[in-house]
């Protein structure tokens, strides 16, 4: 209602601004006898102070009209905008909505890869409407789209900032941003592991490792003779299936009778003697020895008889080896060996033999304990030491010859 009231005032002022002179003249000159305005002026001259004078009204209207003439464009623009908004409030847009969040979210979910342009959902038909030629979108839809995009971009930027902060914190400290986030992350990992374990447990044992299961089953059936490692919970299912097909093992009561009786015999008949049957003769026969059955004559009989008779010795033909065997019993004379180069090496010459005889044995090595320690020389004064005669110097050749003769003498006469 307020909008309509102000719109009517603006329209009236615009109409007056376009026709100012006739209105002013009519207000100043034209008087109705029936109106209070005209009567008050003529009939009641004492009431001029209570009512505004025509001159003041004329001056006020002139000021308003002059102000409006100066800002005519602004007034017309505001008037047109108000008219458009008024018309939009009266006539709703074809595909407008009430502005609720669920409608907005449904309105802007669009497949952008297939069609381009703005999209919305009509509240009346509940159909998706695009901005192609022939379809109209209201101003409210455009504003909603812009707000939605801004909110989405804001959330994306905020998420990126938070992620960057968390990643930097992880790189520095190796932990989550806060203790609460760290706890949530650990809880999620634990739930993920539990889900994986539950999925693994749902797989039957025979489907996990068929080859290993078969080997373990074989080891269990053969009383673990193979010595392979096995687990009972893996072989239980397979052994159960195998044992279900086999008959139950014999008990201690019927272990003796089951050897001679069939399994079809009921337990009451085990105490009473059974009637004779065909199987009795068969069981008695293996206990008695069977007579030897004569074999048919064959060609091999003559060969077997001939093998027991010793064959006469057959005379061998004379050969060259007979004379050799007789000669081996007589001892052969020693034959002289031919002279060779090694004879000189084996028989050493006379000088070498004499030198070997003359070689004296090696001197005996004395131990440290057996060797008598020579007394330490007494210290003498310098004067006494100078009085002693100096040792004579000998030539090197004489020392060598003397040393050699002493050594040879020791070797010859040990």
From Swiss-Prot:
Region (Disordered) residue ranges read: 242-262, 335-402
The yes or no answer to whether the keyword Transferase is present is no
One cellular component term from this protein's GO annotations in UniProt: extracellular region
Name the principal localization, coarsely classed: secreted
First and last residue of the signal peptide = 1-18
Family listed: Belongs to the NPIP family.
Please state what the protein is called.
Nuclear pore complex-interacting protein family member B7
Q: What does the organism's lineage look like at the top? A: Eukaryota, Metazoa, Chordata, Craniata, Vertebrata
Write the gene name.
NPIPB7
């Amino acid at each position: 209602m307020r909008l309509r009231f102000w719109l009517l005032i603006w329209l009236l002022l615009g109409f007056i601004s376009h026709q100012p002179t006739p209105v002013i003249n009519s207000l100043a000159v034209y008087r109705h006898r029936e109106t209070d305005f005209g009567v008050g002026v003529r009939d009641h001259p004492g009431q001029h102070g209570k009512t505004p004078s025509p001159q003041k009204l004329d001056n006020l209207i002139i000021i308003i009209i002059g102000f409006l003439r100066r800002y005519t464009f602004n007034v017309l623009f505001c008037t047109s905008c108000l008219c458009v908004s008024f018309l939009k409030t009266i006539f709703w847009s074809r595909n407008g909505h009430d502005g609720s969040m669920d409608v907005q979210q449904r309105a802007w979910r669009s497949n952008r890869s297939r069609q381009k342009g703005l999209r919305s959902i009509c509240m009346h038909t509940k159909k998706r409407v695009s901005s192609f030629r022939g379809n109209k979108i209201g101003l409210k839809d455009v504003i909603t789209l812009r707000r939605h995009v801004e909110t989405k971009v804001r959330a994306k930027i905020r998420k990126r900032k938070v992620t960057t902060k968390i990643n930097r914190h992880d790189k520095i400290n190796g932990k989550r941003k806060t203790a609460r986030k760290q706890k949530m992350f650990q809880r999620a990992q634990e739930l993920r592991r539990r889900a994986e374990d539950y999925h693994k447990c749902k797989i039957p044992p025979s489907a996990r490792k068929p080859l290993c299961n078969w080997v373990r089953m074989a080891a269990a059936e053969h009383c673990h003779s193979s010595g392979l490692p096995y687990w009972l919970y893996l072989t239980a299912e397979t052994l159960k299936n195998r044992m279900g097909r086999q008959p139950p093992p014999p008990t201690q009561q019927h272990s003796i009778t089951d050897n001679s009786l069939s399994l079809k015999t009921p337990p009451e008949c085990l105490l009473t003697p059974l009637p004779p049957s065909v199987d009795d003769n068969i069981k008695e026969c293996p206990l008695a020895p069977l007579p030897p059955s004569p074999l048919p004559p064959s060609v091999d009989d003559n060969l077997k008889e001939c093998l027991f008779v010793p064959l006469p010795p057959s005379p061998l033909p004379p050969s060259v080896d007979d004379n050799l065997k007789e000669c081996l019993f007589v001892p052969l004379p020693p034959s002289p060996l031919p002279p060779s180069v090694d004879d000189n090496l084996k028989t050493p010459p006379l000088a070498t033999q004499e030198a070997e005889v003359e070689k004296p044995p090696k001197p005996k090595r004395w131990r440290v304990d057996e060797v008598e320690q020579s007394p330490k020389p007494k210290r003498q004064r310098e004067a006494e030491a100078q009085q002693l005669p100096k040792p004579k110097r000998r030539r090197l050749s004489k020392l060598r010859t003397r040393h050699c003769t002493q050594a040879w003498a020791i070797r010859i006469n040990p």
